[in-house]
Amino acid sequence: MIIAIVNQHGTPERTVVARNLAVLRARSGRRVCLMTTAAGADSDWCNDRSSAGVRPWIDTRHVGSRAVPTRLAALRPLFNDILIDAGARDTDGCRCVLAASRLVVVPVRGGALDLDLQYRLLARLNGARVLNPNIRVLFVAVSGPAGPDANERAAVLAHVSRVQHATLALTVLHAPAAFDYGLGRCVSDAAACDPDAAAEMQALYDEVYATLPTMAHSMKAQMGAGHALWR
């Protein structure tokens, strides 16, 4: 199964989410590959992880810019799960990744929505459905330690409503990229971590994987759940 993680900004939340999902998935005994559109970034992280003896070990690959569908097809038999940090830019590689993904996870900051970038991302997600009608899109709200406030809630809900058949995660991530947990580590496996942040990542993981087969709920139901969570 291929899961892509994209967003509209070059913010670290996308990479943080991808790495934590990969670690938690590998910990469950699955063969996991973590891919990125940025050459070397996750390879360096994986090398640091290996050097520090951190387990589970994560295989990392670069998506590349050519023959992406062929590359992904070759990797499918080798891994149970492929997680792809697909970046924030509208590239051919990103489009190919979205066309091959079963689920797209979109971390979004309600208080930092750039209108131009927002519509570019929404167009990319809606366009991916033309080639991949069964694609599912899961937005994840990201806020500061005390958020989300009323304006952030409204912005996130409006953002989600503009993507066809998109859903909103019940989990809210509070400043997930605020701390450095050491070379090759993330909050899900750091020796000394923030238990609240780790619990949020675990909750997001549970939403992404445990409920994936039944994620096709109506937008109305999901928006209602989001409102209930944030009251």
Give residue ranges: language-model regions.
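Conserved C-terminal guanine-recognition region of P-loop GTPase G domains, centered on the G4
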Residues: Q118-P133
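NTP-binding/hydrolysis catalytic cores, primarily Walker-type P-loop NTPases
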Residues: C186-R231
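Beta-strand-loop-alpha "switch" segments that mediate conformational coupling across diverse proteins
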Residues: S143-A150, A154-D189
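Cofactor-binding loop segments of dinucleotide-utilizing enzymes, especially the Rossmann-like FAD-
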Residues: Q8, T37, R109, V142-G144
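P-loop/Walker-type NTP enzyme "switch/lid" segment
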Residues: I2-P12, R19-R95, A99, L131, ...
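Conserved Switch II/interswitch segment of TRAFAC-class P-loop GTPases
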Residues: G87, S101-R120
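Structural beta-sheet core signal
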Residues: C33-L34, I84, V106, F139-A141
